[in-house]
Amino acid sequence: MTSLTCGAAVITFNGMKHLPQQLDSIATQTRAVQHIVISDDNSTDGTWEYLENWAKHASIRVTLVRNQPQLGLIANFEQAVSMVEADIVFSSDQDDVWLPNKVELVAAVFERHPDVQLVHTDADLIDGSGRELGTTLLTELMVSDRERIAVREGKAYEVYFRRNLVTGAAAAFRKNILDLARPIPNVLYHDAWLAFMASAVGKVHLLDVPTIQYRVHGSNMVGVEIGKRKQNMLEKARSFYWALNGKNELAKNINHALSRRTVLYERLSSHPELSPHYKAMASEALQFAQRRQALVSTPRNPVGRTIAVLRNAVRGHYRKYSAAPWSESLRDILNR
């Protein structure tokens, strides 16, 4: 079994509150990373000065980069992962904590399965003070057995067309998928984009155990809505009522989906070596988003909308490309 080199890409911005604990957790892994790239987006709270001192004493090779002016989240991430010199790249937020055997567990999956391009894992959720919240990332995302089976059977892309399950802080990928993934578009989160790219060229593996403590607080770049799965029927009905009466929000969401699916289809279409089936799904998903956009852009016509929605439903498009098929189809019919 081939031994792979591992590296970490850490992006920072004004992260002094939690950064020392995160860096210590990376540096004390049971299986060491060979290279750490830390790309700082022009912090002003002492983060950069701390990084310079930390790098001088680190036992691991460290590359520091300071962006002046700022690049923003996605461009900073792309810069960091591109600079890592390793077979496997572990992406890292500045405020989480790696469990001691994270690299060991994840690297073993890549070494056992050469066709796996990306591994993502569960995470224990903690609050801003580091207290455990008694739940995990996949639990709060309400990942179903059906979704787990699809990923395990090499059909992760069928899941990702409906919704993203990959959180970058709990993921690692083979660096060579950056050949397809770059440049990373700014119309969707980089972890969702990498999940699509990985599933286009190989398999994705869901490691159903926590490998990090994921910090949930008000400053999260990408947060988790704790407790959503515990809503009672009245709360769900109230949420659905407001969704039905939010035409502008619905149009915004559909336009966003259209932008995401456009860039995905264009990227896949520019690579003839990729699976025709995957490209066909990307094309179908794009056409579905285009039809939904046209639907909500026209004056409300319950009969016409119902016919259009039923046509999409019969084709299986809501089931294949919507995270909540029933509620989204009803919104398309009833939204004012």
Feature annotation, model-predicted:
Residues 1-231, 330:
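Nucleotide-sugar donor-binding/catalytic module of glycosyltransferases
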Residues 160-161, 186-188, 192, 204, ...:
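C-terminal subregions of glycosyltransferases and related glycan-biosynthesis enzymes
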